[in-house]
């Protein structure tokens, strides 16, 4: 919904940056993944620094996206790795994530970075089955450092 109003989207990001946790909102940081060779925005990652009741149930600490033309090239693994580094800087030890059961690309990305499936349930709001994962941040970063820090 913010694609039509870039300035409004940036304003929302700024509000989320400074927001105190509540039942409906949590402090959030948004980062872009930019390819060095051509300065093209490849993707983004949204990191929620705290979780409220709703985000513990669906959503978790991280949401991400890769430009459709750049999918299936390994960029989201880099995106998630860098996001986990930011989580570590903020003292987040365990990251909770979820994805649609049929989003195999996202599930593979989460699993590649050490995500362990903790449960699966149906989301009535979105009418889909959701898989939930937990990632030990320190363990993931340690295991993947040589692969993603070149």
Feature-to-residue mapping (PLM):
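GNAT-family acyltransferases
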Residues: 1-61, 86, 128-150
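Catalytic cores of nucleotide-sugar-dependent glycosyltransferases that transfer UDP/GDP/TDP-activated
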Residues: 33, 92, 120-123
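Conserved G/P- and acidic residue-centered "switch" motifs that form tight phosphate/ATP-binding loops
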Residues: 39, 74, 91, 103
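Conserved acetyl-CoA-binding loop-helix of GNAT-fold acetyltransferases
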Residues: 63-66, 72-85, 108-112
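Conserved GNAT acetyl-CoA-binding A-motif
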Residues: 87-98
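Conserved beta-strand-loop-alpha-helix junction that forms the acyl-donor binding cleft
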Residues: 97-107
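Conserved catalytic-core motifs of GNAT/GCN5-like acyltransferases
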Residues: 98-99, 114-132
């Amino acid at each position: 919904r913010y694609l039509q109003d870039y300035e409004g989207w940036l304003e929302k990001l700024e509000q989320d940056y400074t927001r105190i946790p509540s039942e409906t909102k949590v402090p959030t940081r948004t980062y872009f993944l930019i390819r060095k060779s051509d300065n093209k925005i490849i993707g983004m990652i949204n990191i929620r620094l705290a979780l409220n009741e709703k985000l513990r149930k669906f959503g978790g600490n991280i949401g991400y996206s890769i430009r459709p033309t750049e999918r299936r090239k390994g960029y989201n693994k880099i995106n998630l790795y860098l996001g986990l580094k930011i989580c570590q800087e903020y003292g987040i030890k365990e990251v909770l994530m979820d994805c649609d059961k049929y989003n195999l690309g996202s599930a593979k990305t989460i699993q590649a970075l050490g995500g362990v499936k903790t449960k699966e349930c149906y989301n009535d709001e979105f009418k889909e089955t959701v898989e939930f994962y937990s990632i030990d941040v320190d363990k993931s970063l340690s295991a993947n450092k040589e692969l993603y820090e070149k």
